[in-house]
Amino acid sequence: MTAATSVQPSPAPRQPGLRATFNPRKEEKVFLARGAHAFTLPGRRASVNVEVDVEAESDEAALDAKETTITVSYAEKGQESSWSAAKWIKLDRLAKTSQHGVVNEDRATYQQAWSLELLDEAVEPARAIWSALYAFWIRHKRSDRLAVLLKGTQATKVRSYVFEAGLGFKSPCETDLILLDRNAFWQGAGAPAGLHWLQTPVPTRGLFPYVLDFTQSTSPPVLATHPLRPPKPAPGSVVYSRYVFSCSQHLELVHIDVSNPQHFDAYTRWQNSDRVNHGWREKGSDEKHRKYITEKNDDPHAMGVLVLWDGVPAGYGEMVWSKEDGMAAFVGGLGNYDQGTHLLIGEEQFRGKHRFTACMVSLKHACFLRDPRTEVVVGEPRYDLDIIPLLATFLPQEIRKEVELPHKRAVFFVLRRDRFLEEGILE
């Protein structure tokens, strides 16, 4: 085993190897609170309970304590008992976490290493590992990488799982340590069946093959070659599922089903409200709304989704492939796998910056997850809407320009994959 180094920990949050977090304005930083110690996993069929043996004012303070042990338990829905999955223990040891071969030694970042042990009660190793990583990353938001010493009888199994899934890699300078990568986790690497945030991949979670396709339309004006798009999940399917810690509730995106009265009634009520109509301008009869949803369902480039909090409808959003979208001709430069989003929050009880941001982040996350070739997700809200400051404040995206579209003047937002994974508020 490599001896512990005497180098002091690196405190500054912007040093190499530490996460370049996107910070809202100072008065808004309460948004980053972690929430409960118990949370539901994607799909809402299992939950995780986290016990930290240190009393502290925040998760960061607990992790900073000299000695900290984190025990992670897992339970399936409907079961009275849970089983202990894994244990994290903070080590009295520093390890290099900045990028090896890139950062000079005098600038290198050293952080406290942790041990990870899969417990004997862990009857499903893959779920235990995933739950343990989830429980840790939501609390350890400072770093892109974490140095880990694998311990216990299942250490070899954990090591193989992490390496084969791409969740981490062997430390180049300390032979007994591995380095876990935060961004790989939030891309869904190694997620067991049913626990991926993307709940309904069609036809599979693998890459859909490149097949040349063509779209021609006069209203809106479209004349574009682009990749053939994969089929969408069936209406009513859960597309995306994630527990949102700042709100202590579970968010889902469900493919809207025009034949489902709950879906249709909520959608029509929202679009016919004066507040939503100010932004979307889709007020009208049931026939008009049914036609709109049906056309979206028949359109291979767009998918409408309901936003639900703990199963209660809250809003409506859209995920579109941008290359063949109606606004592409007016903004230019969109790639084959670039995507775009639209969002409205219809229910008053689910409004506010915390929930709106969580919904928008989830839509963007779903876009990046459904095709790893997507490098950019764009948005083009009308320039005078009051959501513009929220979008600029709570998402790490850039305002590219204001652009004239046939039906509105819009602010053109561009969100890049690498920045979203590094700085997006997913914890």
Curated annotation (Swiss-Prot):
The active site is at E380 (proton acceptor). It is an enzyme of class 2 (transferase). It comes from the Eukaryota. Its EC number is 2.3.-.-. InterPro entries: Acyl_CoA_acyltransferase, Acyltransferase_MbtK/IucB-like. Keywords: Acyltransferase, Transferase, Virulence. It holds the Pfam family Acetyltransf_8. Disruption phenotype: Impairs the production of ferrichrome A but does not affect the production of ferrichrome. The keyword Transferase applies. Pathway: Siderophore biosynthesis. One of its GO terms (biological process) is siderophore biosynthetic process. The keyword Acyltransferase applies. Substrate binds at H342. Residues 1-24 are annotated as: Disordered. Induction: Expression regulated by iron through the urbs1 transcription factor. One of its GO terms (molecular function) is N-acyltransferase activity. Belongs to the lysine N-acyltransferase mbtK family. Acyltransferase; part of the gene cluster that mediates the biosynthesis of siderophore ferrichrome A which is contributing to organismal virulence. The first step of ferrichrome A biosynthesis is performed by the HMG-CoA synthase hcs1 which catalyzes the generation of HMG-CoA and CoA using acetoacetyl-CoA and acetyl-CoA as substrates. The enoyl-CoA isomerase/hydratase fer4 then catalyzes the conversion of hcs1-produced HMG-CoA to methylglutaconyl-CoA. This is Acyltransferase fer5. It comes from Mycosarcoma maydis.
